[in-house]
Amino acid sequence: YKRQAIDKAMDRGLLGKDILGSGFDFDLHISQGAGAFVCGEGSALTTSIEGNRGMPRVKPPRTVEHGLFDKPTVLNNVETFCNVPPILLNGAKWYQGYGPANNHGTKAFALTGNVQNTGLIEVPMGTTLREVIFDIGGGVKGGAFKAVQIGGPSGGCLCISATEDHLDMKLDFDSLKKVGAMIGSGGLAFDLSLIHISEPT
């Protein structure tokens, strides 16, 4: 789909040379890597695009100084780029209207595993785990679970138990940091295997 979108943009004069007669040139190319998790780190990603094994480089220098092919390189994820057009159209104050103080905007989460409705969602920062699980995810299959793994391998687990209940945890940077977790990749994994977490029941 990405290649089709690029082709359509080229056909309509929205990419390539002299875009819409503006004198501005801009091309997009898709580089497919081996899918290594480490390539989420900027210098590992540029190394992979260059055709080498995706391995992080020692910093400094940062990629904005010496990145892809040793040239200054801006790296942002797709979610960041998706936020730019509506902010340009509606202004920063509009964007700040979503989410709590210091955690403005929206966030994409991927619901996977043992919830009724899996898939990609976008919610305002500060939406609670309870809202995500029950209002959007449709609840957990079987009804009982002990934890939600958030943010990929380095994100952490939010426990649901008699002594530690994170159902009303706000999903934003500051709230998660207080409990030793982080948004990371935005993954929210609900899995039957989590039922077997070692804990007295």
Task: Indicate residue ranges for each PLM-predicted region.
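Residue-level detector of conserved catalytic or cofactor/ligand-binding positions
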Residues: Q4, I195-T201
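Hydrophobic alpha-helical positions that pack around
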Residues: A5-M125, G137-V140
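Short beta-strand elements
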Residues: T47-E50, A110-G113, L171-K178, F190-L192
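Short, solvent-exposed loop/turn segments at the edges of secondary structure
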Residues: H104, A181-S185
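Short, structural beta-strand-to-alpha-helix junction motif
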Residues: T127-V132
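Terminal amphipathic helices with adjacent charged low-complexity linkers/tails
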Residues: G143-A147, G152-L167
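Eukaryotic mixed-charge, acidic/polar low-complexity intrinsically disordered regions
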Residues: C159-M182
